[in-house]
Amino acid sequence: MRLILLSGLLLLGIFLANGHEQDPDGKVLNSLIDALMHLQREFAKLRGAFLTVYKARSFGNGSERLYVTNKEIKNFEALRQICEQAGGHIPSPQLENQNKAFANVLERHNKEAFLVVGDSANFTNWAAGQPNKAAGTCVKADTHGSWHSASCDDNLLVVCEFYFIL
């Protein structure tokens, strides 16, 4: 959408730079201005619709972050690449409600998934006896949202985390 707006501005700039000899009544200029205003209104509607969906999804799962799966089963490195290409991140729940939203996805699919635990995390949800470095250097969550050490070579449900700064 921004590309369309920029294209409209570019056309307007070219028209203004060429002078008005070919459009003495300003019809072309007015047409370009009308088209640009229409695009701005459409962009505002699209942005509003996006924000409505985002807020509804956030409200529904009790978290400002969205956890989405493509239902594929992959190892940690493949997950990292998939999430990055999709514009998301490997899940990293920082609050209990975020972990619950993440666990809801896992429970619906009856699968485990990788997550990333930050060094300065204020929230953790390790299962009893975890972390266990002997099990691996990655972390997975079970269908209840409990965290376990895991091998990064395990193949688990692909879940990516998306959040927006508005």
From Swiss-Prot:
| Entry keyword Calcium | yes
Question: Which Pfam families does the annotation name?
Answer: Lectin_C (PF00059)
Question: What InterPro entries does the entry give?
Answer: C-type_lectin-like, C-type_lectin-like/link_sf, C-type_lectin_CS, CTDL_fold
Main subcellular localization, coarse class? secreted
Single GO molecular function: phospholipase A2 inhibitor activity
Paired cysteines (S-S): C83-C160, C138-C152
Protein's UniProt name: Phospholipase A2 inhibitor
**Record-linked Gene3D superfamilies:** Mannose-Binding Protein A, subunit A
Where does the record say carbohydrate is attached? N61, N122
* Subunit composition and interactions: Homotrimer; non-covalently linked.
According to its UniProt record, which protein family does this protein belong to?
Answer: Belongs to the alpha-type phospholipase A2 inhibitor family.
Q: Which organism is it from?
A: Bothrops erythromelas
Q: In which tissues is it expressed?
A: Expressed by the liver.
Role according to the record? This phospholipase A2 inhibitor binds directly phospholipase A2 in the presence or absence of calcium.
Tell me the keywords, alphabetical order: Calcium, Disulfide bond, Glycoprotein, Lectin, Phospholipase A2 inhibitor, Secreted, Signal
Q: Which GO terms describe its cellular component?
A: extracellular region
